[in-house]
């Protein structure tokens, strides 16, 4: 009889202990999932900074684009009164603001930090999850295109320098060959020297070929620029019209 009484007495404490341990485990897993979201914002490979995840509250924006929080007791805002189409339009407007903030934050650290915070908020909201997955993928593609255009610009700059140097060396070598041939007597003993100087001038003048072909190479580089710009604009235009 004493055993049954002790079992009944200690059973609630054992159940409470098991429940508290499981609750702590689930909370730890949720925190790990929250901290696992990160994406590359620019070509240098910067990531989302770790910070506290905000609670799931309804979010709206003022005219300046600043986020406004609405509590459950606020009479000016009631999410239950919004229709599905109005909610969809609101999501679309928020996403357009987010894209515009991303485009404008390339050289502004303050706007970049603001973008970090906004992205973290939307990751927590179920209504925005599908868009955020697409948004992150598009950002990565857009960054790759930007990095490609920078590489093309660097290649074009090096090519133009090499072309100018080649043209200068070609002009000097041709002038040197003409002067040397004009000062030599066309006798039998000087024929070998003349041939050697002529071959030397021809070899040095080979960069003229690259100078002649430079318009075609420039056309290829410009075509690559146009392709990169076209895809970059197409990506931004598609995501701006996300519904």
Swiss-Prot record:
Keywords: Acetylation, Host cell membrane, Host cytoplasmic vesicle, Host membrane, Membrane, Signal, Transmembrane, Transmembrane helix
Membrane among keywords: yes
Annotated localization: Host cell membrane; Host cytoplasmic vesicle membrane
Topology Extracellular: residue spans: 182-191
Single GO cellular component term: Maurer's cleft
TM stretches of this protein: 161-181, 192-212
GO biological process terms on file: cell-cell adhesion
UniProt topological domain (Cytoplasmic) ranges: 25-160, 213-243
Membrane topology type: Multi-pass membrane protein
Chief location: host cell
Applied biotechnology uses: Potential vaccine candidate as CBP1-based peptides or antibodies against CBP1 prevents adhesion of infected erythrocytes to endothelial cells.
O-acetylserine, modified sites: 55
Subunit structure of this chain's protein: Monomer. May form homodimers or homotrimers. Interacts with MAHRP1. Interacts (via extracellular domain) with human chemokine CX3CL1; the interaction mediates the adhesion of infected erythrocytes with endothelial cells.
Job description of the protein: By binding to host chemokine CX3CL1, mediates the cytoadherence of host erythrocytes infected with parasite mature forms (late trophozoite and schizont) to endothelial cells, which sequesters them away from the circulation and thus prevents their elimination by the host spleen.
Record remark: domains: The P.falciparum Export Element (PEXEL) motif, also known as the vacuolar transport signal (VTS), is a pentameric sequence (RxLxE/Q/D) required for the translocation of proteins across the parasitophorous vacuole membrane. In the endoplasmic reticulum, the motif is cleaved after the leucine residue and the N-terminus is N-acetylated.
Protein name: CX3CL1-binding protein 1
Organism: Plasmodium falciparum (isolate 3D7)
């Amino acid at each position: 009889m004493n055993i049954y009484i002790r079992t009944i007495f200690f059973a609630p404490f054992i159940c409470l202990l098991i429940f508290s341990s499981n609750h702590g485990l689930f909370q730890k897993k949720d925190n790990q999932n929250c901290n696992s979201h990160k994406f590359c914002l620019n070509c240098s490979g910067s990531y989302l900074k770790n910070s506290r995840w905000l609670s799931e509250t309804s979010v709206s924006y003022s005219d300046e684009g600043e986020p406004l929080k609405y509590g459950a007791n606020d009479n000016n805002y009631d999410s239950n009164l919004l229709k599905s189409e109005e909610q969809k339009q609101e999501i679309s407007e928020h996403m357009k603001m987010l894209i515009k903030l991303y485009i404008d934050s390339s050289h502004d650290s303050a706007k970049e930090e603001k973008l970090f915070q906004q992205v973290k908020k939307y990751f927590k909201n179920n209504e925005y999850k599908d868009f955020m997955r697409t948004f992150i993928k598009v950002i990565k593609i857009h960054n790759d295109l930007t990095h490609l255009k920078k590489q093309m610009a660097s290649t074009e700059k090096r090519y133009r320098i090499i072309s100018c140097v080649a043209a200068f060396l070609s002009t000097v070598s041709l002038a040197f060959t003409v002067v040397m041939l004009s000062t030599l007597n066309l006798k039998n003993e000087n024929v070998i020297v003349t041939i050697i100087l002529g071959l030397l001038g021809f070899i040095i003048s080979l960069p003229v070929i690259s100078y002649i072909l430079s318009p075609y190479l420039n056309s290829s580089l410009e075509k690559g620029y146009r392709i990169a710009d076209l895809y970059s604009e197409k990506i931004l235009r598609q995501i701006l019209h996300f519904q």
